[in-house]
């Protein structure tokens, strides 16, 4: 039977901001003594972490990795750029990629519950609290992504600004086109397309754009309206759709043209299956 009341447990959680499981552990270790339980949690580096959780986190890093387990992305935010470049913080972020890949997770809450690959005696949430204690700032795991990498795929990753923006590109048709995939990922970070292709633009967005274009040419003859609208849609697709964009390193060719050229040279049926683009705070 526990040597503490639910009221004591509630008070410990309110004082420290630490999770229920660790608070119970602390009270059991302290034989129900609230002050001793707080000391126990402080020694673990957990108690003061809870007090930092209200602080704003505008800096941080987006990290990515691809290996035989799949591809993973994670965005982790802190208060200052100084801590964003701290080696302890970066080691924590790197461990999260391993955790995502090991457990095939894209959910931040689920990630927080698994045992950390960096410190197997602690959950990710507990290790985050210890890291907060070490670096002296609030840490927030904002989002996470995982997807398997299939046979016959080439994956390219490009990171810009020390992890301020990251893109991952998945090419099908070959396992030997990582350089092309990375070039396209670099292009995505620079050009920030919203969609893969014209066909992938949602119908409601097409209708919205058509309404905007039509209002801009109201009162003109119908054939003029159609011609102008077609031209505006072409410009919209060239700006918003990856495959229609001019390649940043060679504006004379579109991304689709770049892929077609590589496919012809290699004899492989290459295509972009999908891409992921994250920008810090977006």
UniProtKB/Swiss-Prot annotation:
GO molecular function: translation elongation factor activity
Record keyword ATP-binding present: no
Pfam families: EF_TS (PF00889)
Compartments in which it is found: Cytoplasm
HAMAP family: EF_Ts (MF_00050)
Reported function: Associates with the EF-Tu.GDP complex and induces the exchange of GDP to GTP. It remains bound to the aminoacyl-tRNA.EF-Tu.GTP complex up to the GTP hydrolysis stage on the ribosome.
Protein name: Elongation factor Ts
Taxonomic source organism: Chlamydia trachomatis serovar L2 (strain ATCC VR-902B / DSM 19102 / 434/Bu)
Gene: tsf
């Amino acid at each position: 039977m526990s040597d503490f009341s639910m009221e004591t447990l509630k008070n410990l959680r309110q004082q420290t901001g630490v999770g229920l499981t660790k608070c119970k552990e602390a009270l059991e270790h302290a034989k129900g003594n609230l002050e001793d339980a707080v000391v126990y949690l402080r020694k673990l580096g957990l108690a003061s972490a809870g007090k930092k959780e209200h602080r704003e986190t505008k800096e941080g890093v987006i990290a990515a990795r691809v290996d035989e387990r799949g591809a993973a992305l994670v965005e982790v935010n802190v208060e200052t750029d100084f801590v964003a470049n701290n080696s302890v913080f970066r080691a924590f972020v790197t461990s999260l990629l391993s955790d995502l890949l090991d457990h095939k997770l894209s959910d931040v809450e689920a990630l927080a519950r698994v045992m950390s690959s960096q410190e197997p005696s602690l959950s990710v949430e507990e290790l985050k609290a210890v890291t907060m204690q070490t670096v002296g700032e609030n840490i927030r795991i904002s989002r996470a992504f995982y997807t398997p990498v299939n046979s016959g795929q080439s994956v390219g990753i490009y990171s810009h600004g020390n992890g301020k923006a990251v893109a991952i590109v998945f090419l099908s048709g070959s396992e030997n086109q990582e350089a092309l995939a990375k070039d396209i990922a670099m292009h995505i970070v620079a050009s920030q397309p919203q969609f893969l292709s014209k066909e992938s633009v949602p119908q409601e967005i097409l209708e919205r754009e058509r309404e905007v274009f039509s209002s801009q040419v109201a009162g003109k003859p119908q054939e003029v309206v159609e011609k102008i609208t077609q031209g505006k849609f072409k410009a919209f697709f060239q700006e918003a759709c990856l495959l229609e964009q001019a390649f940043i390193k060679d504006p004379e060719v579109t991304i689709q043209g770049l892929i077609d050229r590589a496919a012809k040279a290699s004899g492989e049926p290459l295509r972009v299956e999908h891409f992921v683009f994250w920008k810090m705070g977006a």
